[in-house]
Amino acid sequence: MLAKLKSQFYSLIKGLGYNVTDNAEYRENFPWLMIRTNGYQSVNSFNLNVSSATLALDIFSTYPGEKEIIEIVEDIGSHLMELKDSNPDVLFCYQKTVKILDDKSTGPVRKHGVVVYEFLLGYGVAPVEEVPEVEPEN
């Protein structure tokens, strides 16, 4: 379930034309984005399976301000519902937080955006059987 969601999230971002990966290997082509799993919980019962997935998207930019990261966040956000529409297991999704930091670890100051997305997934829901009405005896 989580692997399918991450794959579809990756495809969505790649389809928008961004350089995206799921590993922390340094890239020369900016901006580049990295998808991370930030949390996953699953609740299973005899007739319902529900999971909560939190994905983090790191955005690395050489733009001197925050504009490029904000535009990327808005672009992805405007297409986020495509994930829900293309995957019937996605019941709900939203952008939870956005933080933009200065990344000084690579020499010159670069901008590093961290965007957190929450997904509620449900699958294997058993149909509810109707119980016939019973007339009370006199």
Language model regions located:
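Charged, amphipathic alpha-helical segments and their flanking helix caps
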Residues: 1-23, 36-138
